[in-house]
Amino acid sequence: DPWSGNGSAQAGDLIKVDVGCLVNGYTSDTGRTYVLGPPEDLQARLHDALMKGFIAGSALLAPGIALAEVHVVTQDAIRAAGFSDYTRGHFGHGLGAGLGSEEWPFISADATTVFEPGMVMAFECPWYITGVGGLIIENQVLITETGHEMMNSLPFDLIEV
């Protein structure tokens, strides 16, 4: 079950870490995936597909780009990496109301919003699979006048612990 469990982590288990903080009224949201011991082949392939989606979608994070376009490109990249049935309602969201809060605007297929300079978004590529676990690559992103700035420097790798 990717959502919960009542046992201890075992070798091969994925550890999805999705964290944030609240400082002076500003919230953050970042996520990474770890694996206890060496990753299984499927785990590595899933993470690689999410990374391809993250890279493809990130390339479009700039003023004037429709959030819906980022959704399409991100999902298409993950599907092209060998997972044609992958579907996700959104690949990110606004920040600000509180920790653990996913708020408008959403990077979704039906979004009508376009990115503007000064927007701060959480851009994410998650996947939750029963029998495998939960994976996520997520960064907080500032939309700048000319593109975007990732707001942390954590590694994106599937990290073995």
Please describe what each predicted stretch is.
Residues 1-161:
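Active-site neighborhoods and metal-handling regions in enzymes and metal-associated proteins
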